[in-house]
Amino acid sequence: MKVRPSVKPICEYCKVIRRNGRVMVICPTNPKHKQRQG
């Protein structure tokens, strides 16, 4: 899980979601693409 100021989808499977007021990227194919804004 990367924590960075701006989160962007890295590949075509990355999904941008909001969880508890935080913007997150989840990726089913490549777990390295997981990000959280903070």
Swiss-Prot record:
Any matching Pfam family: Ribosomal_L36
Record GO terms (molecular function): structural constituent of ribosome
InterPro entries: Ribosomal_bL36, Ribosomal_bL36_sp
One cellular component (GO) term of this entry: cytoplasm
Record-linked SUPFAM superfamilies: Ribosomal protein L36
GO biological process, any: translation
Electron transport in keyword set: no
Keyword line: Ribonucleoprotein, Ribosomal protein
Similarity-based family: Belongs to the bacterial ribosomal protein bL36 family.
Protein name per its UniProtKB record: Large ribosomal subunit protein bL36
Organism expressing this protein natively: Streptococcus uberis (strain ATCC BAA-854 / 0140J)
